[in-house]
Amino acid sequence: MAAAALLLLAAAAAAVVVAMALRWLLLLGGPAAGRLGKRARMPPGSTGLPLIGETLRLISAYKTPNPEPFIDERVARHGGVFTTHVFGERTVFSADPAFNRLLLAAEGRAVHSSYPSSIATLLGARSLLLTRGAAHKRLHSLTLTRLGRPASPPLLAHIDRLVLATMRQWEPAATVRLMDEAKKITFNLTVKQLVSIEPGPWTESLRREYVKLIDGFFSIPFPLAYFLPFTTYGQALKARKKVAGALREVIKKRMEEKAENGGSIGDDEGKKEKKDMVEELLQAEGGSFSEEEMVDFCLSLLVAGYETTSVLMTLAVKFLTETPAALAELKEEHANIRDMKGKNQPLEWSDYKSMPFTQCVINETLRVGNIISGVFRRANTDIHYKDYTIPKGCKIFASFRAVHLNNEHYENARTFNPWRWQINNKLQNAVGANIFTPFGGGPRLCPGYELARVVVSIFLHHLVTRFSWEETEEDRLVFFPTTRTLKGYPINLRLLSESIC
């Protein structure tokens, strides 16, 4: 899913000190070095400095608002597919949309996703992120069943209500860090979808531990960290046990309820209100999922639903604030919807489908922001592309960012321009042409991509129809270890109406 690449990039970066040292020692005399060296037609490029390769150059570039030169300079010298050496090993970078398409489609055959062991330890070996082949297909299908139907009236009602619940906590004139507030919304919504528990002391306690778990993805998991609880990674492991334990208690209770009903979930109204991912798992395949499988699966969905959607919400507001004409048009679109519905009526699917400019804003935020800058894959076999051979075992990075910000595909590509999605018919086929891949593609296409759009649309609707705002201080984007604003995007909010109902 979309968060998979986000976690991979962060964890790989965090582990760079250990990985580079170990990998370098292995490559000095090991068979991998000879195999790579004998391939005359590897994509051209540079391996940079001994031991560290070009890792520091990449990190330095991605810690700025403009990381493009790292890839642009190499594409200019070597072409759209080139070789570098980052995070401890030789890696082929692709800024070629056709090759990226092949990589995404070849998941599970010619390539597979590759993650550090620290990720597996924190998420669990049975998580959606880490499973492969038939096991991944099974979990992906279940996720799509639950998250791929955002038109469901109960789901829309939950989103609408949870967004407003967070906004009610904002005072008539408040200063908030929008990133933090967006994360509260996405966390509470994901918990609701997983286990049907409303925001309260239980969810807040879970969220506090969960934040520690997330911090572990961006830390250095050196060997002693597993045994030292005062390190960031050690604290993340401890938090993982608590989060998994809390989920396990809920799942165990639901399994007991099912057993008491003779293996049936039940059809009474109370049970219908509880319909969530846990019940999907309990009903699937005759209840064949084990308790641990369900815990790992739910934990991985909690991670996937948290970071990327909240960043998308924040960046949409930031880009709109910096583009007054776009903000004015968005406000007009949502004011018209609110006028037709009345002040306090919740949004419905027909309202969501009446937000064409909002979808343009979301597309453009995804394209310019590049919350997922790309995905790593590892070759299962020798891969032949054009005149090059990428050997089995080689790591490959498919850069979505390089394609999204290429002037050959988008006019003035580095300018936020949501109208480009209205007037340029060519872009209507952008997804099919694989020049627009914000949610990945192939078997690992994010199953919750449409739900993410719905959440952001509803959030923007209530924000622009209830508040005005201004930035309290300058905040800039950085892209390492993840896409985010440095300060969480602090803004001053002013309530437009007297109450939020």
From Swiss-Prot:
UniProt-annotated binding residues for heme: 446
MF term (GO), any: monooxygenase activity
CDD domains in the record: CYP90-like (cd11043)
Main location: membrane
GO biological process: brassinosteroid biosynthetic process; brassinosteroid homeostasis
CC annotations in GO: plasma membrane
Pathway: Plant hormone biosynthesis; brassinosteroid biosynthesis
Record's keyword annotation contains Heme: yes
Record-linked InterPro entries: Cyt_P450 (IPR001128), Cyt_P450_CS (IPR017972), Cyt_P450_E_grp-I (IPR002401), Cyt_P450_sf (IPR036396)
Enzyme class per UniProt: oxidoreductase
Membrane topology (UniProt): Single-pass membrane protein
Keyword Membrane: yes
Cofactor(s) the record lists: heme
Induction notes from the record: Down-regulated by brassinolide (BL).
Enzyme Commission code(s) on record: 1.14.99.-
Localization terms from the record: Cell membrane
Annotated Pfam families: p450
Tissue: Highly expressed in shoot apex and inflorenscence. Expressed in roots, stems, leaf blades and leaf sheaths.
Transmembrane intervals: 2-22
Keywords: Brassinosteroid biosynthesis, Cell membrane, Heme, Iron, Lipid biosynthesis, Lipid metabolism, Membrane, Metal-binding, Monooxygenase, Oxidoreductase, Steroid biosynthesis, Transmembrane, Transmembrane helix
Family: Belongs to the cytochrome P450 family.
PANTHER family: 3BETA,22ALPHA-DIHYDROXYSTEROID 3-DEHYDROGENASE, CYTOCHROME P450 26
Function: Catalyzes the C23-alpha-hydroxylation step in brassinosteroid biosynthesis. Converts 6-deoxocathasterone to 6-deoxoteasterone in the late C6-oxidation pathway and cathasterone to teasterone (TE) in the early C6-oxidation pathway of brassinolide (BL) biosynthesis.
Protein name listed in UniProt: Cytochrome P450 90A4
Species, as recorded: Oryza sativa subsp. japonica (Rice)
Gene for this chain: CYP90A4
